[in-house]
Amino acid sequence: MDSPAFAVTGMFAAAKVGVTSFTGATEPVSTRRRTSGNVTMAVDAFQKKFQTFGKIGVDYSRPKKLASYKRGGFDAASVEYPNAPSFAGKYSIAPCGQPSGASKILMKYDEYCAKGVLQVFKRNAVPFGVYTTKCTEGTVAGQAQEKRVFNRTMAFRQAQKPVNVRLAEQYEARRKCFILANGCSREEDQFKSMPVSAATFLAGKHESLGTCFRVVTPSNIAEDYIASGVRMQLVAKSNSTGVYGVGSCMEGFAKGDAEARRVAALAAEYRALQQSPAAVTGRQYESSRMAVKLYAQNCSHEQEQLYKWPATAAAFCRY
């Protein structure tokens, strides 16, 4: 037989022979495949929509033109479904429901600055790159993802609030940021025209300093009683009719969320006490100082109470 029965055309590749003693001086055949200099990677549309802050291999020290800046993490047409509630519902306040062209440009710049502010406070909270026991993302597998979903849900509810509620929150956040600016005209101008940066600055300030009643625990029964009374009064003030409004409920939005949030709160209090005495004492001093600056500037009685009971001051800073 000339060839085996199972052999088909193209089954065996032809041998490519270079220069040998049996062949002529032919050009050697290169077996290496040519590759392009630019390596491209296909990114799924869903992954691109929910990407995190920042990208690997991008030099953020060299700013791009504002018109070429593209929003990452959510839709470029509106800031309605971001990663945190402080980014939501700021630029949808318009007579027709749609922001103007100038507002869209300012929206991009405001969000760009807010992301930078957020990164600064993250580095301040974790200066050595290692998270402490104060981290509140979760203690078991799956809780971190649940927290991210909860934050996006909170951002969605934040954008659904009435216009008067959102405006009141913007003006209150601006007032607090003016106080924390300590007379810096440049920061005051930024907080005046950039509501997203103001809300992010306020949230990052409280988070980095630890001025929250979740991490500042009462030292005795009397302090616990006073701090609980302050929290009850603030909740009653924000929900005067007894019915929680859209975006005001912090316990959850589905069955089982409330219990999971309570367990997470107790775990956060436990982890906060595992830090060094210097960190615990520093959070107490920062809570008292922050509450006096923002809420008790001219009342000597409240200042005395806030300096005496740090957990009460942290309850003021929470709401």
Swiss-Prot record:
Phycourobilin 2 binds at C135. It comes from Corallina officinalis. Residues 1-71 form a transit peptide. It is found in: Plastid, Chloroplast thylakoid membrane. (2R,3E)-phycoerythrobilin binds at C212. It is a peripheral membrane protein. GO terms for biological process: photosynthesis. Contains four covalently linked bilin chromophores. Phycourobilin 3 binds at C299. This is R-phycoerythrin gamma chain, chloroplastic. One of its GO terms (cellular component) is phycobilisome. Keywords: Antenna complex, Bile pigment, Chloroplast, Chromophore, Electron transport, Membrane, Photosynthesis, Phycobilisome, Plastid, Thylakoid, Transit peptide, Transport. The keyword Transit peptide applies. It comes from the Eukaryota. Phycourobilin 1 binds at C96. Heteromer of 4 alpha, 4 beta and one gamma chains.
